[in-house]
Amino acid sequence: ALAGLAFAQVESVNIVGYTTTQISSATWYQIAPTFIPVGGIPEDGMPINDLFTTGFAAGDVLYVWNQTSQSYDFYTWMDEPFDPDYNVLPAGWADSTEIRTEAVLKAGQAVFLRKASAGATSVVFAGQVEGGIVTTVPSATWVQVSLPYPIDVALNDEIAWTGFAAGDAIYVWNATTQ
């Protein structure tokens, strides 16, 4: 009965997927995207306003570590942020001047998120899994990172820590004690 049917082999050059994190109200989270844009490269990053999209309201905040200034860039959710010409844009994350941000996060670039508004939401990261992502830590600086893969690993078992010396430190966010 199947004679004469042709079957095509399907191949893909990329592996795509998604992860979902439940976000409760009045709680701090350290969270990071674990994917790159489909068909993209790790350096592209993903826009903050494409990553954290629904279930947020005025008062919710996002802190992104700025490697250059060694301080946090602060964003707040706005129902009607502006563009540089002060045209009203769709709801999203905006900087202190109320301009909708175009900032991007790379896979493994962690941020602090606090949902101050009532009600829980879900953050869904979707994209392409990229192998071989490397996080570079310049000398005498801080970097806020997360594992760039959506899996749990032991700190000293599956992470290649290279180039570190006595006195270097790592701090791990404890979600329970905040």
Q: What residue ranges belong to the model's regions?
A:
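A short, polar beta-strand/turn micro-motif
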Residues: A6-A58, Q67, I99-A166
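Intrinsically disordered, low-complexity segments enriched in small/polar residues
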Residues: V16, V61, Q70-Y75, P84, ...
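Fold-core signature of tandem repeat domains
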Residues: L62-V64, L113, I170-W173
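A cross-kingdom feature marking solvent-exposed beta-strand/loop segments within repeated
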Residues: S69-A107
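Short, intrinsically disordered, charge-balanced linker/junction segments flanking boundaries
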Residues: T176-Q178
